[in-house]
Amino acid sequence: MENSSKSIGIVLSGGGSKGIAHAGALQFLTEQGIQPSCIAGTSAGAIVGGLFAFGKTPEEILEFFKSIYFFHWKHFTFKKAGLIDSESFKSYFAEIFGDITIGELKIPAYITATDLVKGKLKIFNTETKLIDAILASSSFPGMLSPYEINNKLYSDGGILNHFPTDILQGRCDYLIGVYVSPIQNIESKDLKSIKSVTSRAFDLLYANYNYQKFNLCDWVIEPKELANFSTFETSKTKMDAIFEIGYNEAKISFQNLDI
């Protein structure tokens, strides 16, 4: 990183509201003059990555998250396969992006989603409208209805690739990964039901797979304190806290880098 000629890639994991920590980390990187030449993101990482690649500052990204009332009654649906209609969030993004495509972004971005029918990971091409790619990537299964693009149904990119480090392999000289989905802190008393044990087992399974990808990064920013927050935080105070946690973890890990 001391060599300014090095191209830098940034990978942003999924994580719901905890993705606000991505913005905090980007704030620190920006202050250090570290600018990515490419970005890859899924789910919450796709939202933050898309906004940043478009030109929004980390503080503006935080304010964007705070402006959305996720559980507004207008967002609920009874006709689609989800508690909330993913299409209902289009207006929030349209005010910012309009009809721009991924290829028109200031920073090249790679956004992923899961093709529910084919069961394959989709990396959207440069001609895809940014709004469509982001909404498809962040359609959390069960909570948000699948998002349709050209008669194909897509759901959260994190289903198949929660931390898409592999997408930027060979596309940059130095890779920074920001991972905002640490394992939740629990105690034995929290594992008293079939549901809780099953959920914990899958959390550990996915975590093991994602942690292996840390080896593909030159620098990993993982705010473990985020384990104390839920995936769907609605408190603006907690959103501010998550932003600060991301910033502080980036700062601490930067000081400990062996470069």
Regions found by a protein language model. Name each.
Residues 1-42, 50-259:
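Patatin-like phospholipase
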